[in-house]
Amino acid sequence: MAPLDLDKYVEIARQCKYLPENDLKRLCDYVCDLLLEESNVQPVSTPVTVCGDIHGQFYDLCELFRTGGQVPDTNYIFMGDFVDRGYYSLETFTYLLALKAKWPDRITLLRGNHESRQITQVYGFYDECQTKYGNANAWRYCTKVFDMLTVAALIDEQILCVHGGLSPDIKTLDQIRTIERNQEIPHKGAFCDLVWSDPEDVDTWAISPRGAGWLFGAKVTNEFVHINNLKLICRAHQLVHEGYKFMFDEKLVTVWSAPNYCYRCGNIASIMVFKDVNTREPKLFRAVPDSERVIPPRTTTPYFL
């Protein structure tokens, strides 16, 4: 079989187009092999730029790259939730996969709670694949990649990046390293908590209104940071109208990278640039104006007629 034409894949994806089904399968298989080599806590060196949820907002992802720099010029960590809710989950995920395939050391993709079979069947990605390809094969190839995505990244051994937050079952980074991640996200337990939990003004742990994960407070955050010699925890998972929000004496930051979320929230988005572990700079960006994006018709015409 001919080697993958990664340059072609990147070029197609950059135009907000999706790949022929067989090419997508090959790209997904290729990225799965790359992800197999990554640790549950993937080490990353500064300088690096950390990004939050994207949710299929392809044109805003392009704006993110205009704001932060293109791959491979900038080294990126994306903290999950690439798909669902936006119009272009398929094209967004394809673009990120193509970049990962071409420059694996310049882009780290973490798993969010939406990188799951169950959630994508409810919030849009499954239906989008069905509409655009006329079958569910593309969705199946992508969900295999979901299972392989790593859970956390560790910047210069001092900044932990994870989609959701902490777990009462996890005290040390080594406990994250031993999770069996190649599976659908479970309904409870450590793996589930890492992608579902939220920081909140609570004492230690509280029941989450999301029905998965926990609410965790300053005390457990400070303990976790202290035990693991961390400076900061970066996470996404929650809309922040100002784009980012520090909590718990600046031991934790939420980064949100989907501007005007769901095309109606009116929020600003951000990315967090780390020159080194002590030098961080949020970069803010707004949604691309409607005149610069293609709004799909209510019912997309199937690709193969």
From Swiss-Prot:
Keyword Oxidoreductase included in the entry's annotation: no
Enzyme class: hydrolase
Reactions mediated catalytically: O-phospho-L-seryl-[protein] + H2O = L-seryl-[protein] + phosphate; O-phospho-L-threonyl-[protein] + H2O = L-threonyl-[protein] + phosphate
Binding site for Mn(2+) 2: 81, 113, 163, 237
Primary localisation category: mitochondrion
Cofactors (names): Mn(2+)
GO cellular component, one term: cytosol
Gene Ontology molecular function terms on file: metal ion binding; protein serine/threonine phosphatase activity
BP-aspect Gene Ontology terms: G1/S transition of mitotic cell cycle; innate immune response; negative regulation of cGAS/STING signaling pathway
Tissue/organ expression: Highest levels found in spleen, brain and lung.
Binding note for cofactor: Binds 2 manganese ions per subunit.
Summary of the function given for this chain in its UniProt record: Catalytic subunit of protein phosphatase 6 (PP6). PP6 is a component of a signaling pathway regulating cell cycle progression in response to IL2 receptor stimulation. N-terminal domain restricts G1 to S phase progression in cancer cells, in part through control of cyclin D1. During mitosis, regulates spindle positioning. Down-regulates MAP3K7 kinase activation of the IL1 signaling pathway by dephosphorylation of MAP3K7. Also participates in the innate immune defense against viruses by desphosphorylating RIGI, an essential step that triggers RIG-I-mediated signaling activation.
Matches recorded under PANTHER family: SERINE/THREONINE-PROTEIN PHOSPHATASE PP2A-RELATED
Protein name stated in the entry: Serine/threonine-protein phosphatase 6 catalytic subunit
Naturally occurring in which organism (per UniProt): Rattus norvegicus
